[in-house]
Amino acid sequence: MQVLIVRLGAFGDIIHTLPLAADLAAAGHQVGWLCEDRWAPIIAGSPVIQRIHRLPRKALKDRALPPLARFLALRRVVRELRAARYDAVIDAQGLAKSALFAALCAAPRRIGHALPRAREMSWLISRRRTPVAATHVIDQQRALGLPLCPGQHRRGSWRFPLPAWSAERRWAEQWLARAGLTKAWVLNVGAGWPTKVWPRARQVEFVRLLRARRQPALLAWGTHVEHDLAEEIQAEAGHGILAPPTSSPQLAGLFAASAVVVSGDTGPLHLALALGVPAVGLFGPVPAERNGPRGPGYRTFQAPGAAWERRDVSKVDLGAIAAAAVVVAAEAAMRERLACVTASA
């Protein structure tokens, strides 16, 4: 069966949906994926995804683009989807825009989340609605595949069929060698929501603790604002090296060659989980039990504060997470991961 997954973004959400693609492929289905073009590199080359449909972000976001140009760009995507002749489509996002493309692809079977997971009336498009029975978002996504592969999501642990990214891994190893970084601790300084960013003072304290331990530190960033924050942390802590500008695959290469990743609830944290790199997740507005990494080699902290608050940092106290406690958790995660790898060797 030809199955289309509609998950347009973002970084972490794409990662969280990969186990669904793995389940579908294991059940013998051919998997296609519709996502925004900027996120396509995360899944391009995945061994379980046969076709990627790239939705031009400008066609969705850029109001300066002439209406006709936007219409033509979107029409090209719809025609491409219909030409693929999918047998089933899974709306793994649950928003109006994802539901629209799920409907326009013309697959006879449409599967999506039920209320309250589905929003913006998207549930009206789905002919098969999956109720939210699981706590973790990955398990919620995998449940969408049950109508097409019953019981598949109960077999074993999460699987993340990432691309090999061989060239990016070689590039990362060469860059780290030139920078003199061997098994560095990675601190991802930013996040998409202001309320998910560990306060600068805590990040400075964390890097200073690494300096006292003579532990190499790599400061990862994604936007210009995060780059400036990383520079400030480096200057104030007197330690750490800023990562270069990277694509998602290049960031994966840096993570794969590092000892541990410390990050808020954002794409890079979930990438570390998918790569099997030890990680410590710092959570605030979103519950760690819903979004956080789990299993050997992973630790999470949950700060007090308002649930799902995006912008008002006064309502989420990420500063309650102490730097020293994060160091201890990172050490435990690395030991646990090493023991797991050794036991399976």
Model-based region annotation:
Residues 1-345:
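Catalytic machinery of carbohydrate-active enzymes
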